[in-house]
């Protein structure tokens, strides 16, 4: 198994208005974004080209908003990891374009 391009654990994953997990995992691997529960069960996944992500004006520096398969998720993680997630998602999408 290849090493993921990005992986963050302990992520709070919310689908408005409820929290799905407080200790989930966000993983970018093989051109796909996967949102996982703390037990490793998949919440949602999609090819990185189909994912929209960014920072919302109302979210703090530790949060990102991602739209996966038409569903908006709020991902709260350490501030440095949040920026790293957005950058890794952009890089992965660029890598898919080059292949």
Predicted regions and their residues:
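Anionic N-terminal interaction surfaces
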Residues: 1-27, 83-94
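Short amphipathic alpha-helical segments, especially helix-boundary/capping motifs
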Residues: 6-9, 39-40, 63-64
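Short, mixed charged/polar active-site loops
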Residues: 21-23, 41-45, 72
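A short, compositionally biased micro-patch
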Residues: 28-29, 38, 68
